[in-house]
Amino acid sequence: MSKTELLDRWTIEKSEELYGIHNWGAGYFSISNQGEVLINPFRDTPEAAVSLIDIISGIRERGMEMPVLLRFENILDSQLSYLNESFAEAIATLGYQGVYRGVYPVKVNQQQQVIEEVIRFGQRYHHGLEVGSKAELIAALSVMKDQEACLICNGYKDEEFIDLGLYAVKMGFKL
């Protein structure tokens, strides 16, 4: 079979299957009828979708070269909402008397912009952070302002780590 014949038989569905986009895209990524990867920043909202090719073209028009790191705050915000609202729904359905306080494990992505967005958007849910090192604890203390949010300290605790944690408690944080 020639390359042309193969391409003539190729479908969007075959691209979706080949790349497993339904397995990892979670409604935030899809493939257009033109075969381009689309970013759906508000999950399953095709009217808000943006072509990855258009994003790359815009980046190049600004004189930037590849590779670049693309960060979609809307996706992070949407996932924080989904997580917290799912727990709120389960709590209400089951008549649970406690509250849910989510925490973001800093080790997953320590980039300042990500941590700041988790804190900024997550404040409505009192979403906190989980840290496992002195550096992470110091970073968390510098951005956390909501004293209803939890700050979870995991990992090896030397005297300095414990002192930092005790100072955080004095500052009003829940550890």
Positions of PLM-derived features:
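Active-site-proximal beta-alpha core segment in soluble small-molecule metabolic enzymes
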Residues: G95-L175
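A general structural signal for short secondary-structure junctions and capping/turn motifs
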Residues: L18-I21, G27-S30, G58-E61, S142-M144, ...
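Short, flexible coil/linker segments at or flanking structured domains
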Residues: E17-Y19, M64, L94, Y125
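A short linear-motif detector with a strong N-terminal bias
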Residues: L7-W10, E16-L18, P46-A48, S81-L83, ...
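N-terminal start-of-chain detector that recognizes signal peptides
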Residues: S2, D8-T11, N74-D77, G102, ...
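Low-complexity, highly charged intrinsically disordered N-terminal segments
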Residues: S32-Q110
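Short secondary-structure boundary micro-motifs
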Residues: T11-K14, G20-H22, S51-I53, G58-I59, ...
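N-terminal basic/disordered segments at the start of proteins
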Residues: S2-T45
